[in-house]
Amino acid sequence: LILDVGQKSKDFKMIKQRALEIGAKDAILVDAKNEFANEYISKAIKANALYEGVYPMSAALSRPLIAQWAVNIAIKNGAQAIAHGCTGKGNDQVRFDVTINTLYPKIKILAPVREWNMSREEEIEYAKSRNIPLELDTDSIYSVDENVWGRSSECGPLEYPEKEPPKDLYGWITYPEDAPDKSETLSLKFKKGIPVELNNEKIELYE
């Protein structure tokens, strides 16, 4: 299952093809961008949902929707288990497990990365040893999660808080020294707490 919640850096056709090439019986791609925006992000905006008052919970917000789709597809196909790739260190394992168990208590949950206690480096070596193709680029040393609501990164140099994050980490921002000399003003119009117009043009929330 591949859920598109606005990951601009992902090639979904390639991901789907790769899943089939390494043995998946099927690879289901769901365009959930508007559902994510209208059913989840809208509520986060209205609630001003910021972790510790500063951090938009972009990754966390998408997990219940992904788990919900996994359950729906599992039921539709008569699956006996749902597998996910969460580690045993992060909070995502809880978000997936709790949502899945709440919606479908009878289904078995498989979490091989957690059960085998694999590090990121071990995951990469495991994939290489079994000829599973990987996209190894500058992002490979980081664990990056991206959707329409935000982008978060961890691992690599970020494990050392005393060090400044390297410039190649950032995918959505422009450093001041690289920015255009001319500024730009944006106008947003809200209705019942939700943005509905950008520069006097009506838009969907996802856009």
Each predicted region: which residue ranges?
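Nucleotide-activated chemistry modules centered on ATP-dependent adenylation/adenylyltransferase
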Residues: 1-207
